[in-house]
Amino acid sequence: MKLLAPVLWAMAALGVTWLVAVDSKESCTKHSNGCSTPLRLPCQEYFRPACDIHDNCYHCGKTFGISREECDKAFLKDMNTLCKKLGSNSATCPARGKREVTSHRATSIAHSRLWKTALDQKSFLNRKARQVFFLLPTTCQGWAKNYHLAVKLAGANSYSVTTDLETCQGLEHCLPNH
């Protein structure tokens, strides 16, 4: 029994450390809605950690003296860091769903045929679709810039200008530079 006691203490300590790590990671989603957009866009799930930090920054930034501009700059930096993790072999964000992973080539071929068919028609809507289609980024960094631009243009109402120490207490590690 004397030999077993230190092992049990070590296991308990490791278990508590693991639970604290899981709890602190989940606490970072408390004020987050992920990378919320009305459309399903590429990199949404891949950028989720950066979006969680950004959402927390928008909710608790004022409380900890972080401006909206600092939140947005950190958001772009975090997304670019995620993009760099992909390396030079993969310029686009990895797909999350099983179907997306298994049918990557077939999907891109099917999409190109659908777009070609749709864009060959000579209507006003298709001219607009052609303009939008060619503006869409094709790289992870390109999508990071678009997400950053979107929050700069449309995120003003989401940044909390009030301090809320009660709900933000303990979330310092969920903010940029913490």
From Swiss-Prot:
It is found in: Secreted. Residues 1-24 form the signal peptide. Expressed by the venom duct. The active site is at H54. Its EC number is 3.1.1.4. One of its GO terms (cellular component) is extracellular region. One of its GO terms (molecular function) is toxin activity. Its main location: secreted. One of its GO terms (biological process) is arachidonate secretion. InterPro entries: PLA2_conodipine-like, PLipase_A2_dom_sf. It comes from the Eukaryota. It is an enzyme of class 3 (hydrolase). Residues 98-130 form a propeptide. It catalyses: a 1,2-diacyl-sn-glycero-3-phosphocholine + H2O = a 1-acyl-sn-glycero-3-phosphocholine + a fatty acid + H(+). The keyword Signal applies. Catalyzes the calcium-dependent hydrolysis of the 2-acyl groups in 3-sn-phosphoglycerides. This is Conodipine-P3. It comes from Conus purpurascens (Purple cone).
